[in-house]
Regions:
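TPR-repeat structural position
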Residues: 4-7, 56, 97, 141, ...
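Structural motif corresponding to the intra-repeat A-B loop/turn of tetratricopeptide repeats
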Residues: 1-4, 53, 94, 138, ...
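"A position-specific structural signal for the A-helix of alpha-solenoid helical repeats
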Residues: 38-41, 45, 49, 79-82, ...
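Amphipathic alpha-helical segments of tetratricopeptide repeats
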Residues: 12-28, 64-72, 105-116, 146-156, ...
Protein backbone atom coordinates (compact mmCIF):
# COMPACT_ATOMS: atom_id res chain seq x y z
CA UNK A 1 0.00 0.00 0.00
CA UNK A 2 1.26 3.45 -0.87
CA UNK A 3 1.93 5.99 1.86
CA UNK A 4 -0.93 8.56 1.93
CA UNK A 5 1.65 11.31 2.40
CA UNK A 6 3.42 10.21 -0.78
CA UNK A 7 0.12 10.06 -2.66
CA UNK A 8 -0.78 13.53 -1.43
CA UNK A 9 2.60 14.90 -2.48
CA UNK A 10 2.19 13.32 -5.91
CA UNK A 11 -1.27 14.85 -6.28
CA UNK A 12 0.09 18.28 -5.36
CA UNK A 13 2.88 17.91 -7.93
CA UNK A 14 0.42 16.91 -10.65
CA UNK A 15 -1.85 19.81 -9.70
CA UNK A 16 1.02 22.22 -10.29
CA UNK A 17 1.99 20.64 -13.61
CA UNK A 18 1.08 22.66 -16.73
CA UNK A 19 -1.82 21.48 -18.86
CA UNK A 20 0.00 22.10 -22.12
CA UNK A 21 3.79 21.75 -21.85
CA UNK A 22 5.92 22.56 -24.84
CA UNK A 23 5.82 19.49 -27.11
CA UNK A 24 9.18 17.92 -27.96
CA UNK A 25 10.58 18.29 -31.43
CA UNK A 26 11.14 14.54 -31.69
CA UNK A 27 8.87 12.67 -34.09
CA UNK A 28 9.46 9.25 -32.49
CA UNK A 29 6.24 7.80 -31.11
CA UNK A 30 7.96 7.31 -27.75
CA UNK A 31 8.48 11.07 -27.52
CA UNK A 32 5.28 12.29 -29.18
CA UNK A 33 2.64 9.76 -28.13
CA UNK A 34 1.16 12.12 -25.52
CA UNK A 35 1.15 15.27 -27.64
CA UNK A 36 -2.22 16.99 -27.34
CA UNK A 37 -3.20 14.82 -24.37
CA UNK A 38 -1.46 16.45 -21.42
CA UNK A 39 -4.64 18.03 -20.02
CA UNK A 40 -6.47 14.70 -20.33
CA UNK A 41 -3.69 12.75 -18.66
CA UNK A 42 -3.31 15.32 -15.90
CA UNK A 43 -7.04 14.99 -15.15
CA UNK A 44 -6.74 11.19 -15.15
CA UNK A 45 -3.81 11.22 -12.75
CA UNK A 46 -5.54 13.62 -10.38
CA UNK A 47 -8.64 11.42 -10.41
CA UNK A 48 -6.61 8.29 -9.83
CA UNK A 49 -4.67 9.84 -6.96
CA UNK A 50 -7.85 11.11 -5.31
CA UNK A 51 -9.35 7.65 -5.69
CA UNK A 52 -6.29 6.14 -4.01
CA UNK A 53 -6.61 8.70 -1.22
CA UNK A 54 -10.26 7.82 -0.66
CA UNK A 55 -11.64 11.07 -2.06
CA UNK A 56 -14.39 9.34 -4.01
CA UNK A 57 -16.53 12.38 -4.85
CA UNK A 58 -13.58 14.33 -6.21
CA UNK A 59 -12.34 11.31 -8.17
CA UNK A 60 -15.80 10.88 -9.72
CA UNK A 61 -15.78 14.53 -10.76
CA UNK A 62 -12.42 14.08 -12.50
CA UNK A 63 -13.80 11.02 -14.30
CA UNK A 64 -16.73 13.06 -15.62
CA UNK A 65 -14.43 15.89 -16.69
CA UNK A 66 -12.17 13.45 -18.48
CA UNK A 67 -15.04 11.95 -20.46
CA UNK A 68 -16.17 15.41 -21.54
CA UNK A 69 -12.76 16.57 -22.76
CA UNK A 70 -11.92 16.60 -26.47
CA UNK A 71 -9.17 14.20 -27.55
CA UNK A 72 -7.13 13.85 -30.74
CA UNK A 73 -8.74 11.69 -33.41
CA UNK A 74 -6.09 8.99 -33.03
CA UNK A 75 -6.64 8.62 -29.27
CA UNK A 76 -9.30 5.97 -29.79
CA UNK A 77 -11.27 5.14 -26.65
CA UNK A 78 -8.60 6.54 -24.30
CA UNK A 79 -10.71 9.12 -22.45
CA UNK A 80 -13.59 6.74 -21.71
CA UNK A 81 -11.21 3.94 -20.75
CA UNK A 82 -9.21 6.07 -18.33
CA UNK A 83 -12.38 7.49 -16.78
CA UNK A 84 -13.45 3.89 -16.17
CA UNK A 85 -10.07 3.30 -14.54
CA UNK A 86 -10.69 6.12 -12.07
CA UNK A 87 -14.11 4.74 -11.13
CA UNK A 88 -12.73 1.23 -10.82
CA UNK A 89 -9.95 2.41 -8.52
CA UNK A 90 -12.48 4.13 -6.25
CA UNK A 91 -14.51 0.92 -6.07
CA UNK A 92 -11.40 -1.18 -5.45
CA UNK A 93 -10.38 1.06 -2.55
CA UNK A 94 -13.81 0.43 -1.01
CA UNK A 95 -13.45 -3.34 -1.46
CA UNK A 96 -16.27 -3.68 -3.99
CA UNK A 97 -15.13 -5.98 -6.80
CA UNK A 98 -18.57 -6.07 -8.43
CA UNK A 99 -18.43 -2.29 -8.84
CA UNK A 100 -14.92 -2.56 -10.25
CA UNK A 101 -16.03 -4.96 -12.95
CA UNK A 102 -19.10 -2.83 -13.65
CA UNK A 103 -16.89 0.23 -14.10
CA UNK A 104 -14.97 -1.59 -16.82
CA UNK A 105 -18.10 -2.68 -18.70
CA UNK A 106 -17.90 -1.30 -22.22
CA UNK A 107 -14.18 -0.50 -22.06
CA UNK A 108 -12.69 -0.90 -25.54
CA UNK A 109 -8.97 -0.13 -25.11
CA UNK A 110 -8.74 0.96 -28.73
CA UNK A 111 -5.36 2.31 -29.81
CA UNK A 112 -2.63 1.80 -32.34
CA UNK A 113 -0.14 -0.89 -31.32
CA UNK A 114 2.75 1.59 -31.36
CA UNK A 115 0.90 3.91 -28.98
CA UNK A 116 0.02 1.10 -26.58
CA UNK A 117 3.65 -0.04 -26.57
CA UNK A 118 4.97 3.48 -25.96
CA UNK A 119 2.53 4.64 -23.28
CA UNK A 120 1.17 3.20 -20.02
CA UNK A 121 -1.95 5.29 -20.59
CA UNK A 122 -2.73 3.72 -23.95
CA UNK A 123 -1.52 0.24 -22.95
CA UNK A 124 -3.37 0.39 -19.60
CA UNK A 125 -1.51 -2.41 -17.79
CA UNK A 126 -2.64 -1.04 -14.44
CA UNK A 127 -6.28 -1.06 -15.45
CA UNK A 128 -6.00 -4.58 -16.84
CA UNK A 129 -4.54 -5.81 -13.56
CA UNK A 130 -7.19 -4.06 -11.46
CA UNK A 131 -9.92 -5.54 -13.65
CA UNK A 132 -8.41 -9.02 -13.45
CA UNK A 133 -8.15 -8.81 -9.66
CA UNK A 134 -11.82 -7.91 -9.37
CA UNK A 135 -12.88 -10.70 -11.71
CA UNK A 136 -10.80 -13.24 -9.80
CA UNK A 137 -12.24 -12.02 -6.49
CA UNK A 138 -15.72 -12.58 -7.93
CA UNK A 139 -14.85 -16.15 -8.94
CA UNK A 140 -14.78 -15.29 -12.65
CA UNK A 141 -11.48 -17.02 -13.36
CA UNK A 142 -12.22 -17.64 -17.04
CA UNK A 143 -12.48 -13.88 -17.60
CA UNK A 144 -9.61 -12.94 -15.31
CA UNK A 145 -7.04 -15.33 -16.80
CA UNK A 146 -6.75 -13.68 -20.25
CA UNK A 147 -6.16 -10.30 -18.61
CA UNK A 148 -3.45 -11.75 -16.38
CA UNK A 149 -1.87 -13.46 -19.39
CA UNK A 150 -1.86 -10.17 -21.28
CA UNK A 151 0.54 -8.77 -18.67
CA UNK A 152 3.52 -10.63 -20.08
CA UNK A 153 5.91 -7.79 -20.89
CA UNK A 154 5.66 -8.58 -24.59
CA UNK A 155 3.24 -5.77 -25.38
CA UNK A 156 5.03 -3.00 -23.53
CA UNK A 157 7.79 -2.36 -21.01
CA UNK A 158 5.11 -0.87 -18.78
CA UNK A 159 3.73 -4.36 -18.20
CA UNK A 160 6.93 -5.51 -16.49
CA UNK A 161 5.94 -4.60 -12.89
CA UNK A 162 2.81 -6.71 -13.25
CA UNK A 163 4.35 -9.92 -14.60
CA UNK A 164 5.14 -11.56 -11.25
CA UNK A 165 1.81 -10.68 -9.56
CA UNK A 166 -0.05 -11.86 -12.67
CA UNK A 167 1.91 -15.11 -12.69
CA UNK A 168 1.01 -15.70 -9.05
CA UNK A 169 -2.67 -15.25 -9.86
CA UNK A 170 -2.44 -17.54 -12.89
CA UNK A 171 -0.87 -20.14 -10.64
CA UNK A 172 -3.73 -19.79 -8.18
CA UNK A 173 -6.28 -20.18 -10.99
CA UNK A 174 -4.52 -23.28 -12.32
CA UNK A 175 -4.32 -24.70 -8.80
CA UNK A 176 -8.04 -24.14 -8.21
CA UNK A 177 -8.76 -25.95 -11.46
CA UNK A 178 -6.60 -28.94 -10.51
CA UNK A 179 -3.77 -28.28 -12.99
CA UNK A 180 -0.85 -28.75 -10.60
CA UNK A 181 1.89 -28.86 -13.27
CA UNK A 182 0.76 -25.59 -14.79
CA UNK A 183 0.41 -23.97 -11.37
CA UNK A 184 3.96 -25.03 -10.52
CA UNK A 185 5.27 -23.35 -13.67
CA UNK A 186 3.61 -20.06 -12.75
CA UNK A 187 4.81 -20.17 -9.14
CA UNK A 188 8.35 -21.00 -10.25
CA UNK A 189 8.37 -18.00 -12.54
CA UNK A 190 7.35 -15.69 -9.71
CA UNK A 191 10.26 -16.97 -7.62
CA UNK A 192 12.68 -16.51 -10.51
CA UNK A 193 11.50 -13.05 -11.45
CA UNK A 194 11.43 -11.55 -7.98
CA UNK A 195 14.01 -13.59 -6.09
CA UNK A 196 16.07 -10.40 -5.59
CA UNK A 197 13.09 -8.08 -5.16
CA UNK A 198 13.01 -5.36 -2.52
CA UNK A 199 11.92 -6.36 0.98
CA UNK A 200 8.30 -5.09 0.66
CA UNK A 201 7.81 -7.47 -2.29
CA UNK A 202 9.30 -10.55 -0.67
CA UNK A 203 6.01 -11.71 0.93
CA UNK A 204 4.70 -12.38 -2.58
CA UNK A 205 7.80 -14.43 -3.35
CA UNK A 206 7.42 -16.42 -0.13
CA UNK A 207 3.77 -17.07 -0.96
CA UNK A 208 4.70 -18.32 -4.42
CA UNK A 209 7.36 -20.63 -2.97
CA UNK A 210 4.94 -22.00 -0.38
CA UNK A 211 2.33 -22.66 -3.05
CA UNK A 212 4.96 -24.24 -5.28
CA UNK A 213 5.93 -26.67 -2.51
CA UNK A 214 2.26 -27.48 -1.96
CA UNK A 215 1.42 -28.26 -5.59
CA UNK A 216 4.60 -30.26 -6.04
CA UNK A 217 3.47 -32.39 -3.14
CA UNK A 218 0.09 -32.89 -4.78
CA UNK A 219 1.41 -34.19 -8.12
Amino acid sequence: QADPAELGAARDAVTRAPDTPEPPQETSVFMSVHNGLHRNLRTYLLGLLDARLGNGARAAQYARELEAMPTPSDAGSLARDLAAGIRAESAARRGRPAEVTAAFDGVLRESWYEMAAASPFFGQPRERFVQAEALAAAGRDAEAAPLYRSLSGQGSLFELPYIAPAQLRLGEIAERQGRADEAAEHYSRVSQLWRDADAPLQPLVREARARLAKVRGER
